[in-house]
Structures are given as structure tokens and as C-alpha cells.
Amino acid sequence: MARRPHNAPPQRDTGPRVNDKIRASEIRLIGADGENVGVVHPAKAMAMAEEAGLDLVEISPNATPPVCKIMDFGKYKYEQQKRESEARKKQKIIEVKEVKFRPNTDTHDYEVKMRNVYKFLENGDKVKVTLRFRGREMAHQNLGRELLERVAEDVKEMGKIENMPKMEGRQMIMMIGPLPQK
């Protein structure tokens, strides 16, 4: 075990209390096969757990009296980690994809870029539509705004506009989010 720096706070045990760590004066005991034994003294419950070759695990510490169960703690921890990893797998990470346009983007290029926007929205990702102005194009910001409004109109069946087009330096940016799944 690694040494702890002298100024670090003591490590807190985050898991459920097990065996002799249970400090209640009496507990509600659930047996190894799930039957309710009743309210007993922790020492008696510990003796029953040792006799069965298992651990006494505090399941709900906030109940009165606290509920404890006779079970294999290693197996319980393993099952809990498995459940947590399954929950993490099911979470969808929403990424922000970026599609860049120019004020003079031609029809075919526009269609190709829009196909990408549709694909990203179908996958449940957000899309950041960036319109970059170069040199004297800054004088024609209205063309850029019209292009982004056209993009917004084309994606309204698949996504919703989260941020309306706004200027950031030499770029006009708009965020599109996917519609919630029904």
C-alpha cells in the first residue's frame, strides 16, 4: 500500500459497512437465502454469517434499525461494478461535429456538406455550422446569414437550432441539436 502524505485527509471508506465495521446496537437481518430473520444484535448476526462462511453487509444504513444481509461481499462488489459498467455503456456521449461553409459555397458542395449534417444529426450528435469570411467577404455578411438560414430551414425536420447565427471574429456560427428520439 502506498504511503499517504502527512497533510492529506484520511481516506473515506465509500462502500457499505461490512462485518465488524457495523456500529448499530441492533440490526434487521436478512439471511443468505433472502428470508427475513428479524431484529437481532450485530454480534449474533456476525456469528451466523461466520457459520455460513459469508459476510455481514449493511445494505441500507439509513433505515431504523439498519438493514443488513448475510452474503459474499466480494461477489456483491463484483455484481455492483458490473451494473455500473453496464450503465456507463448505455450512456450516449453527444459529440459536437463541425461543418464549415464559405459565403460562396456552390450548390453541389452545399448538398455534400448537408448530407454530412444529416448524418451527424441521425447519429445523435450536435452540429456546429461555421461560416468563414475571408478578406472583403466581411462586407457581405448578409449573404452568410442567408446561407445559414437556408441550412436551418433544410434541417428543421431532423434537428433544432440551439444557437441562432452569430458573429465570432471572422466567423458566423450556428449550433444545431438533434431532435429528441420518440
From Swiss-Prot:
GO biological process: ribosome disassembly
Family of this protein: Belongs to the IF-3 family.
Residues annotated as signal peptide: none
Domain of life: Bacteria
InterPro entries, alphabetized: T_IF-3_C_sf, T_IF-3_N_sf, Translation_initiation_fac3_CS, Translation_initiation_fac_3, Translation_initiation_fac_3_C, Translation_initiation_fac_3_N
Principal subcellular localisation of the protein: cytoplasm
SUPFAM superfamilies in alphabetical order: Translation initiation factor IF3, C-terminal domain, Translation initiation factor IF3, N-terminal domain
Annotated gene: infC
Record text on subunit structure and interactions: Monomer.
Location within or outside the cell: Cytoplasm
Protein name, per record: Translation initiation factor IF-3
Function summary: IF-3 binds to the 30S ribosomal subunit and shifts the equilibrium between 70S ribosomes and their 50S and 30S subunits in favor of the free subunits, thus enhancing the availability of 30S subunits on which protein synthesis initiation begins.
